[in-house]
């Protein structure tokens, strides 16, 4: 998949058909009720389930209200511009509760944990773990065999479109609740300490900590031992 630039993402959002999908449980005299051309209906006798756009189904419910005994509508978005990514054929481990929008690239054997939010245009490399409640903003790019710690934020850049996105190179470990601001590059093999706020580029194979984050040392054997990436967690 070619990574989208900011202007392509803006155009994608602008020109997309905005969607308010619903799932409707319905009971009544349902024979002959038309729920719209795009709706999918699973009706047996006087009960059923209907999937479709709220504008179509709302009209059908109002027109046929005398035939309907009971109805429950499930809805989780309104005028959404970007669908969720189809996960069925992705060769990665993606846990329940992760929110991943369309036009996101996920490498083989990546791991995305519960509560992670991955915005449009983001890239996640092979074997990288995105831990619980991580936020990857639009166009954020993470390389191979990284670990992005729980609650961390990689700032997104869609507007202004001229801004540079966050880039995390291969073999990087970012501790829990760290924040990496837009335009920052984290060099290969670097370690970002938990809670750090990174406002400037990080050199490869260095350790940074603090707010704002500053270099505290080069990577040594002790640090490597504490930040080892375990491939066993990435096997499918």
Curated annotation (Swiss-Prot):
It is an enzyme of class 2 (transferase). One of its GO terms (molecular function) is tetrahydrodipicolinate N-acetyltransferase activity. Gene3D superfamilies: Hexapeptide repeat proteins (2.160.10.10), Malonyl-CoA ACP transacylase, ACP-binding (3.30.70.250). InterPro entries: DapH, DapH_N, Hexapep, Hexapep_transf_CS, Trans_hexapeptide_repeat, Trimer_LpxA-like_sf. It catalyses: (S)-2,3,4,5-tetrahydrodipicolinate + acetyl-CoA + H2O = L-2-acetamido-6-oxoheptanedioate + CoA. Pathway: Amino-acid biosynthesis; L-lysine biosynthesis via DAP pathway; LL-2,6-diaminopimelate from (S)-tetrahydrodipicolinate (acetylase route): step 1/3. PROSITE patterns: HEXAPEP_TRANSFERASES. Keywords: Acyltransferase, Amino-acid biosynthesis, Diaminopimelate biosynthesis, Lysine biosynthesis, Repeat, Transferase. One of its GO terms (biological process) is diaminopimelate biosynthetic process. Its EC number is 2.3.1.89. Catalyzes the transfer of an acetyl group from acetyl-CoA to tetrahydrodipicolinate. Belongs to the transferase hexapeptide repeat family. DapH subfamily. This is 2,3,4,5-tetrahydropyridine-2,6-dicarboxylate N-acetyltransferase. It comes from Bacillus pumilus (strain SAFR-032).
């Amino acid at each position: 998949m070619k990574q989208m630039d900011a202007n392509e993402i803006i155009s994608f959002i602008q020109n997309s058909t905005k969607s308010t999908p619903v799932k409707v449980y319905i009971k009544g005299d349902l024979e002959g009720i038309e729920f719209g051309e795009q709706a999918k209906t699973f009706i047996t006798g006087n009960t059923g389930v209907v999937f479709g756009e709220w504008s179509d189904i709302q009209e059908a419910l109002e027109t046929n209200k005398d035939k309907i005994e009971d109805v429950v509508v499930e809805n989780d978005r309104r005028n959404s511009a970007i669908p969720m990514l189809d996960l069925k054929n992705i060769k990665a481990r993606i846990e329940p509760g992760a929110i991943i929008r369309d036009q996101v690239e996920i490498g083989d054997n990546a791991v995305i944990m519960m509560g992670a939010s991955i915005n449009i245009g983001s890239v996640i490399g092979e074997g990288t773990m995105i831990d619980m409640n991580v936020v990857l903003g639009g166009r954020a790019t993470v390389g191979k065999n990284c670990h992005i710690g729980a609650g961390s934020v990689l700032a997104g850049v869609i507007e202004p479109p001229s801004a540079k996105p966050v880039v995390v190179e291969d073999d990087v470990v970012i501790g829990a609740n760290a924040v990496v601001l837009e335009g920052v590059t984290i060099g290969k093999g670097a370690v970002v300490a938990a809670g750090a706020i990174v406002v400037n580029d990080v050199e490869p194979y260095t350790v940074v900590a603090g707010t704002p984050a500053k270099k505290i040392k080069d990577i040594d054997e002790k640090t490597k031992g504490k930040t080892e990436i375990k491939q066993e967690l990435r096997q499918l």
